[in-house]
Swiss-Prot record:
Gene Ontology MF, one: metalloendopeptidase activity
Segments crossing the lipid bilayer: 707-727
Described purpose of this protein according to its UniProt entry: This is a non catalytic metalloprotease-like protein. May play a role in sperm-egg fusion.
Record protein name field: Disintegrin and metalloproteinase domain-containing protein 5
Organism per entry: Cavia porcellus (Guinea pig)
GO cellular component: plasma membrane
Residue stretches of biased makeup (Polar residues): 744-760
Lineage: Eukaryota, Metazoa, Chordata, Craniata, Vertebrata
A family per Pfam: Pep_M12B_propep
Keyword line: Disulfide bond, EGF-like domain, Glycoprotein, Membrane, Signal, Transmembrane, Transmembrane helix
Biased composition (Basic and acidic residues): 763-777
InterPro entries, per the entry: ADAM_Cys-rich, Disintegrin_CS, Disintegrin_dom, Disintegrin_dom_sf, EGF-like_dom, MetalloPept_cat_dom_sf, Peptidase_M12B, Peptidase_M12B_N
Modifications made to the protein after synthesis: Subject to proteolytic processing during epididymal transit of spermatozoa.
Length: 777
């Protein structure tokens, strides 16, 4: 027994590595256990029972993906030649989660080849590593401590502190309404490990890679508040020698590293490059360019790993530097507070163990930076993981179901109840001879198009839906038109979504009736954290931020029980309210109440909260998730600008004008209203009658202004063409006259030359004759 104790003590010192302050706690054999989530999704959810200081703790974990199939590690062999390997084997190893029963806890594990990671409570952290020399899945647990607590945060120049003071002065004058809501953003990171750190972490490619991935896992866990997620693009390890001179002055080394990055690494503009180094007694913890995360030239940093610190502390250093580049400054005010004992952006955070959260000042800094400068360089989607699409089975065409489907000219119902027997053949769904239409609310029994302006679809929601009218050119009613998603309704307390004003109260009234209302948040949190058929967000229980988007929970003020056909009801007494949640029983008999009945959002029924329902200030529900309202609509129509504040935007991105204003731009016009899409005829002038609106969005047929358009465009064109023709005719005459004169002069010259030639030919002959006569004499 004594020998075993000595062995474990020695192993504890060995696995503690270069930090002599790591306190060995115990060895343990983690036991993988089964739960609701792990039974349904073995690949994405795991749970372990871990004994720590004599107590048993259940650790619940969910897979985290910050590697892609294209992530690569680069290193150098003994000859200095660069080699590369995919990081694919490490892709499915990273998990994060919490300790059950401890809301202020955090767990980050790598599960390949044993468990390796950190368990964080409020004021203490424990590291766990596998003991490879012992069999039976034995692990060692030790308490994280830091030996070196005197590392300067800023360095000698203290530049970040000065920047913070200047920024704080400027930001105090900015009203909080300029702060935007946070949305998920992804930082693609190119990580370089220099030779010093490579040697300090073990001088082994695989070991160093695992530790870097573990550090980034901790970084992502800390960035949850800011909705930032670091994705590892590549890891380059300078395993032979440093490519950049290490001067031990991070501020100077940063410029050298940035210059090396520009010359040797081809990165996209939204990639951030970081050099991770080691220094026993550094001047500071690192360097970066504050507020330049989106600047291609300056999106880089240097993080220094001081001797005697833990991997947890190194993760805090990286978080602080990345935060600086994203506009988050260090906390220097007593008014900054957070939910943990130590806030992330403080010097104490680097050396303290346990949980750390961003302070109120940090959150304001980040939101201000995002609203003022934007984070468009950062992707808003994670890596596209390959999945197989689940195509729904193709629906078979059915003639006689009163629905006109592909391949049918009309469908008036069955032979017995056909609504347009004169117009449509109910057996073949073909229009009869001479019929203009065969079915539809705008088709008369005489097979003619209904007159324009006849109501064909009445609004079902006074705030969010619009009436539609026959346009006089089709037997069908025009496409459904309704308010743009995100338009306020219910006196500003809810959002319009797909033509309905979505509120918890209305949904409860429709589901169970009586004086039921939407339950308070405490009820939703209590019920939807169950993870069963009565409370869930589909495949699993709802996390607290999404609790209002799972199963519908209502208050029930009546003494009698809820009695509804095909509904099973559960009651919960939360504080002063009786809350009820329901599940449908008509589809199948519930045999296992620990399992949810719906796996896909498309399969939800009325017992779930509807999409578009408010789940927080400026937030709405979408497929079990509570999202920022900025994502609720992607249209370009702005009611204040495009509709001049006299209408609202519809789902087709056009203005629906209030009464007394005419579309499309809602100009004042007595008696007018609506949009270009609702089918009714829009009056344009007192004398010219009406302008007919085509069913196709944005296409307008101008029946009265067409001739005016032709007149105003055609007349100038005709004048220009006529002028050209006249000009060409005059030029032609001039050309012909010039040609005639030229020919005349040519002919005169020719005749003159002929006469002259004849005269000249006569004189030599006479001269010769006279000479002969003189010779004879």
């Amino acid at each position: 027994m004594f020998l075993v104790l000595v062995l474990l003590t020695g192993l504890g010192r060995l696995y503690a590595g270069n930090n002599p302050r790591k306190t060995f706690v115990q060895t343990t054999v983690p036991e993988r256990i089964s739960s609701v989530d792990t039974r349904r999704h073995l690949e994405h959810n795991v749970a372990y029972n871990i004994t720590l200081k004599g107590k048993s703790y259940v650790v619940r974990l969910k897979k985290e993906s910050f590697l892609s199939s294209g992530s690569v590690i680069y290193f150098y062999d003994n000859r200095g030649v660069q080699r590369s390997q995919p990081l694919l084997p490490e892709m499915d190893c990273s998990y994060s989660g919490y300790v059950a029963g401890f809301p202020h806890s955090r767990v980050v594990f790598a599960t390949c080849l044993g468990l390796r990671g950190v368990i964080q409570f409020e004021n203490v952290s424990y590291a766990i590593e596998p003991l490879e020399v012992l069999s039976g899945f034995t692990h060692m647990i030790y308490e994280e401590n830091n030996d070196n607590t005197h590392v300067p945060l800023f360095g000698k120049n203290n530049s970040y502190a000065r920047i913070h003071n200047l920024e704080s002065q400027g930001r105090r004058s900015v009203h909080k309404t300029t702060v935007s809501k946070l949305s998920p953003r992804y930082i693609d990171m190119y990580i370089v490990v220099n030779k010093n750190l490579f040697d300090y972490l073990g001088s082994d490619i695989k070991t160093v890679t695992q530790k870097i991935i573990q550090v980034i896992g901790l970084v992502n866990a800390m960035f949850t508040q800011l909705k930032l997620h670091v994705l590892i693009s590549s890891i380059e390890i300078w395993s032979r020698s440093n490519k950049v001179t290490n001067t031990r002055r991070p501020d100077d080394d940063l410029f050298r590293f940035s210059d090396w990055k520009r010359k040797h690494v081809s990165l996209k503009s939204h990639y951030v490059a970081y050099l991770l180094t080691f220094d026993k007694y550094p001047e500071s913890i690192g360097a970066t360019f504050p507020e330049n995360i989106c600047n291609e030239e300056y999106a880089s940093g240097i993080a220094v790993y001081p001797a005697g610190l833990s991997l947890e502390s190194f993760a805090v250093i990286i978080v602080q530097l990345l935060s600086l580049s994203a506009g988050v400054m260090y906390d220097t005010s007593d008014s900054c507070y957070c939910s943990t004992d130590v806030c992330t952006m403080t010097q104490e955070a680097v050396f303290a163990s346990g949980l750390k959260d961003f302070s109120t000042c940090s959150m304001d800094n980040f939101k201000y930076f995002a609203s003022q400068y934007g984070l468009t360089c950062l992707r808003n989607t994670s890596y596209d993981m390959p999945i197989y699409k689940q195509f729904p089975p193709r629906r078979r065409r059915i003639c006689g179901n009163s629905i006109r489907e592909e391949g049918e000219e009309c469908d008036c119902g069955t032979l017995r109840n056909c609504t347009h027997k004169k117009c449509c053949d109910p057996m073949q769904c073909r229009m009869k001879k001479g019929a203009k239409c065969g079915t539809g609310p705008c088709c008369t029994v005489d097979c003619q198009f209904q007159k324009a302006n006849v109501l064909c679809r009445k609004s079902v929601d006074k705030d969010c839906d619009f009436d539609e009218y026959c346009n006089g050119r089709s037997g069908d009613c025009v496409h459904d038109t309704y308010a743009q998603n995100g338009h306020f309704c219910d006196s500003g307390g809810a959002f319009c979504f797909n033509g309905r004003c979505r509120t918890h109260d209305r949904q409860c009234q429709a589901l169970i009736g009586g004086d039921s209302r939407g339950a308070p948040f405490a009820c939703y949190d209590e019920v939807n954290s169950r993870g069963d058929v009565y409370g869930n967000c589909g495949r699993h229980q709802c996390y607290i931020q999404h609790a209002l988007c799972g199963k519908l929970v209502c208050t029930w003020p009546h003494k009698q029980l809820v009695s509804r056909v095909n509904l099973s009801v559960v009651y919960a007494h939360v504080r002063d309210d009786i809350c009820v949640a329901t599940t449908k029983t008509v589809r199948k008999i519930i045999r296992d109440l620990s399992l949810t009945t719906v796996l896909l959002p498309e399969d939800r029924d009325e017992t779930f909260v509807e999409d578009g329902t408010i789940c927080g200030p400026g937030q709405y529900c979408d497929k079990w998730f509570c999202k920022e309202v900025q994502f609720i609509n992607n249209g370009s129509c702005n009611a204040e600008i495009h509709c001049q504040g006299r209408g609202i935007c519809n789902n087709l991105d056009n203005c629906h004008c209030h009464k007394g204003f005419v579309p499309p731009e809602c100009a004042p016009k007595k008696g007018q209203f609506g949009s270009l899409d609702d089918g009714h005829l829009v009056e344009t002038t007192k004398t010219s009658g009406f302008r007919k609106i085509n069913m196709r969005r944005g296409y307008v047929v101008l029946s009265t202004k067409r001739f005016q358009l032709i007149f105003y465009i055609g007349i100038p064109v005709i004048i220009i063409v006529a002028a050209i023709l006249i000009k060409q005719n005059q030029l032609g005459k001039l050309f012909c006259r010039g040609e005639k004169e030229h020919m005349s002069s040519v002919s005169e010259d020719g005749s003159r030359s002929v006469t002259l030639s004849a005269t000249e030919s006569k004189f030599p002959a006479d001269t010769e004759h006279s000479n002969k006569e003189e010779d004879a004499q």
